[in-house]
Design a protein with these regions (language model features):
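Alpha-helical bilayer-embedded segments of polytopic membrane proteins, i.e.
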Residues: 1-34, 61-66, 119-130, 146-188
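Membrane-embedded catalytic scaffold of the fatty acid hydroxylase/desaturase
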Residues: 26-146
Length: 188
């Protein structure tokens, strides 16, 4: 909480300065830490009751981090049920990075170029993963599959985006606000 308060104070004091990007980087780190707290709550490791942990994880994931708790819980449960099992673990599905030689061998175009250099490109690509995780979570909520507490998750996400994005885009010039958001997501 103190870190978020310091970021708000620092942002107000800096005004229209490109040093705001340092605040954005700090927020990226803080949101990552809150995401880890949501992870621990989802594993029921923080509070004494399961339902209380679920509520906390949903609040932290959706309301603070800005990612769908139900999407993450579904994906993470499948991962824990079948760790590193091809076709069952969503964490090793074909995406930008190939975990299997067969996937790398069948890659074409840009994905092939990335796959051939993925060892060198891993950390630069990691800067895009925050954006990817947010997009996948939103796609899950907007999808047709049943989502437990979809309305609650949408409400928390809307509140979170209003609290974070509206001040950034109202108080900073448009280009600086876009850079702020980009840095925050890259560090996340």
């Amino acid at each position: 909480m103190l870190g978020f308060a310091a970021c708000i104070a620092g942002s107000v004091l800096l005004g229209h300065s490109w040093f705001q990007l340092l605040i954005a980087a700090a927020l990226g780190i803080l949101f990552t830490q809150v995401a880890f707290l949501a992870h621990e709550a989802a594993h029921r490791q923080i509070l004494s009751s399961g339902p209380a942990n679920d509520r906390l994880a949903r609040f932290l994931g959706n309301g603070v981090v800005g990612m769908s708790y139900s999407w993450w819980a579904t994906k993470h449960t499948r991962h824990h049920a079948n760790p590193n099992r091809v076709g069952k673990d969503p964490d090793i599905d074909v995406d930008t990075i190939s975990f299997l030689d067969e996937d790398a061998a069948t890659a074409r175009g840009l994905r092939r170029a990335i796959t051939r250099r993925q060892g060198w490109l891993f950390f630069p690509l990691l800067t895009l993963e925050g954006l990817n995780l947010h997009a996948l979570a939103l796609r899950h909520l907007f999808g047709r599959q049943p989502v437990e507490k979809r309305g609650t998750e949408f409400a928390l996400l809307a509140l979170r985006f209003a609290i974070v994005l509206i001040p950034v885009f109202l108080l900073l010039p448009l280009g600086m606000a876009a850079a702020f958001l980009g840095v925050q997501l890259a560090v996340f």
